[in-house]
Amino acid sequence: MAKRTKKVGITGKYGVRYGSSLRRQVKKLEVQQHARYDCSFCGKKTVRRGAAGIWSCHSCKKTVAGGAYTVSTAAAATVRSTIRRLRDMVEA
């Protein structure tokens, strides 16, 4: 099948509505939310978004909570590193 859009991608469904800058922002989010991600349990690239914040691996059937548009958010990464640092301080 021929490629239909070059610039607009997934936001071509909105046509000329809503303005180009808003469609560009939506494109970034929609590409992230429809992408497949690596599973932290089985290592396969089969994690898909089920609903806002719910991510399921279709290989090992694990379900994890994450961000609305990506599996892991920047805030979650900060929390994980802080917990790891505090755990190391307690153990040392």
Curated annotation (Swiss-Prot):
Annotated keywords: Metal-binding, Ribonucleoprotein, Ribosomal protein, Zinc, Zinc-finger
Any one GO MF annotation of this record: zinc ion binding
A GO CC annotation given for this chain: ribonucleoprotein complex
Pfam families: Ribosomal_L37ae
Gene3D superfamilies: 2.20.25.30
The keyword Hydrolase is annotated on this UniProt entry: no
InterPro entries on file: Ribosomal_eL37/eL43, Ribosomal_eL43, Ribosomal_protein_eL43, Ribosomal_zn-bd
Highest taxon of source: Eukaryota
This protein's record includes keyword Cytoplasm: no
Example GO BP: translation
Zn-finger region bounds: C4-type: 39-60
The family this protein is said to belong to: Belongs to the eukaryotic ribosomal protein eL43 family.
PANTHER family according to UniProt: 60S RIBOSOMAL PROTEIN L37A, LARGE RIBOSOMAL SUBUNIT PROTEIN EL43
Name the UniProt record assigns to this protein: Large ribosomal subunit protein eL43
Native species: Candida glabrata (strain ATCC 2001 / BCRC 20586 / JCM 3761 / NBRC 0622 / NRRL Y-65 / CBS 138)
